[in-house]
């Protein structure tokens, strides 16, 4: 029941958002505001629709790691432009402030995307991205893992409480991440380089050695998990 309800709600949500984005764009055109309005269509993560035998999000694989991000900025961003730079939702605040002509605080996380949207990617722009999921045990039952990607390759480590496994994917030859190449001699230098970058990212981000308690409840004795197992959260027919 959970999968059926989840996916149906998800598809209904997409249809509703699509319809109402269309209404908003029509309004901007009708009122003449479109020429002086920046429209950004985005999400906080991707979503699985059966890939890797999964639905929902949480894993580091491409289907949920990648996030929709479309920009319409008349006179600034060239229509039809596709950019493959690594950006993140942490960049949004700086971007919106700069677009609005407001001061961007020096201590804010993320960087403004305005130069990229103008077609001028800074030479020192990020070339890798770190991801970390630690909400286990929890009723989603997604194992703790972290990893790093440079857009071409992705290194992942699954850890605790009883696993210590690595995966490495070549996203050019294996875009769906079906076959890990971790440990293969021809990828030795790539693997070593990504491990070095992974450790660097963890230092820079000050990732604690010990994870905080899972935020979604943990294990068979968790009140949250118990309610789910007993069917107390099932929808009424």
Report residues per predicted region.
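Long, internal low-complexity/basic segments
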Residues: 1-5, 13, 17, 181-237
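Histidine-centered active-site microenvironments of extracellular/periplasmic hydrolases
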Residues: 26-81, 88, 139
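A long, amphipathic alpha-helix that forms part
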Residues: 1-37
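Solvent-exposed, polar/charged alpha-helical surfaces in well-ordered, non-transmembrane soluble domains
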Residues: 19-22, 26, 94, 98, ...
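C-terminal cap/loop subdomain of S1 sulfatases and analogous C-terminal strand-loop tails that border
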Residues: 45-51, 90-93, 98-167, 171, ...
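Active-site rim elements
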Residues: 1-12, 56, 76-87, 99-104, ...
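Beta-strand elements within well-structured catalytic alpha/beta cores of enzymes
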Residues: 14-17, 21, 38-43, 69-71, ...
